[in-house]
Amino acid sequence: MDPEISEQDEEKKKYTSVCVGREEDIRKSERMTAVVHDREVVIFYHKGEYHAMDIRCYHSGGPLHLGEIEDFNGQSCIVCPWHKYKITLATGEGLYQSINPKDPSAKPKWCSKGVKQRIHTVKVDNGNIYVTLSKEPFKCDSDYYATGEFKVIQSSS
């Protein structure tokens, strides 16, 4: 067996869609967790849209599936239950409130830290929910908790 072909096949397989459940189930619960190609993800149903991201918060590995969804600056965010970090459902950006120390009377404004949480693609087909892992080449802070030594789930040997 050619090891190069095997590695290519494994890489392709990692980006195939995986059925994670039924649409009717997630609409009731508004969230669900799944393992997609050995990566734990959480899928949210919020305001008529589906969103999927790594299950562990980029900051300290908090369980995002246990967080509340709130709107900040017109963006729907999951709030990590451990340290209250705010992550946009649509883009995975971390949000924070900026305060100008030279003008204490100024109102704090919402700012982005950039993309911190890896977002995955969700598709609905014939009542089934499918998740495809992100192929984006950049590193996200949440990758630290989804891969390598801090990975929460173990692959079967």
Swiss-Prot record:
InterPro entries: Rieske_2Fe-2S (IPR017941), Rieske_2Fe-2S_sf (IPR036922), Sol_Rieske_ferrdox_dom (IPR054716). Residues 16-127, 17-131 form the Rieske domain. It comes from the Eukaryota. [2Fe-2S] cluster binds at residues 57, 59, 80, 83. The keyword Phosphoprotein applies. The modification N-acetylmethionine is found at residue 1. Keywords: 2Fe-2S, Acetylation, Iron, Iron-sulfur, Metal-binding, Phosphoprotein, Repeat. PROSITE patterns: RIESKE (PS51296). Binds 1 [2Fe-2S] cluster per subunit. GO terms for molecular function: 2 iron, 2 sulfur cluster binding; metal ion binding. CDD domains: Rieske. The modification Phosphoserine is found at residue 6. Pfam families: Rieske_4. Gene3D superfamilies: Rieske [2Fe-2S] iron-sulphur domain (2.102.10.10). Its cofactor is [2Fe-2S] cluster. The keyword Metal-binding applies. This is Rieske domain-containing protein. It comes from Mus musculus (Mouse).
